[in-house]
Amino acid sequence: MVAKAKEKVKAENVRFDMADLTKRWNCEDGAYDFIICNLVLEHIKDLYDIFSEAARTLRQGDKFFINELHPFKQYQGTKARFERNSATIEVDAFTHHISDFTNTASASGFKLIKINEYWHAEDQNKPPRLVSFLFEKA
C-alpha cells in the first residue's frame, strides 16, 4: 500500500513511513503536521498508544485523520479479508466503538473536528461501511 501511495502522491513535502504502530515511532517530537491511519486501527487492540504517539509527533493545531471499518459492520460480523492464491484470508480485528476513538483522542489531547460515515451507493438504508474522524491536536 505504501508503494501505491507513493505512486499517486509525488509532492516533495509528503513523506510515507511504514512502521510497527504499537511501538514508539522512530521520529522526533513534532515531526509531522498530518497523520493518516487508513483501515489499520481495527487490527490494533489498544488505541491509547497510537493516539499518544500521534500526539507526541504532531504540533498544536496539526491534524490526525483516521478512516476505519465502521463498528456497525463489525457488529454484523464483517471482517477485514484479502485474497491470496485464490484463498480468502481473514485478518484478526478488534471492534472499537465510536466512543473508543473519541474518548481516547480526548484523553490524548485531541479535539474532534469532523466525523463522517460512508456507504456504498446501493447500501444507503443499511449500516455504514466506513467511518472517518478528523482530530486536531489541542
Question: What are these model-derived regions, one by one?
Answer:
Residues 65-95:
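Conserved class I S-adenosyl-L-methionine
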Residues 122-138:
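Core SAM-dependent methyltransferase catalytic element
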Residues 5-6:
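Conserved SAM-binding loop
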Residues 48-63:
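A short glycine-rich, Lys/Arg-flanked "PGG" loop and its adjoining helix->strand segment in the class I
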Residues 93-115:
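Short alpha-helix
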Residues 10-26:
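Conserved SAM-binding strand-loop segment of SAM-dependent methyltransferases
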Residues 25-35:
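A short acidic, Gly/Pro-enriched loop at the edge of an enzyme's catalytic core
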Residues 33-47:
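A short SAM/SAH-binding and catalytic strip from SAM-dependent methyltransferases
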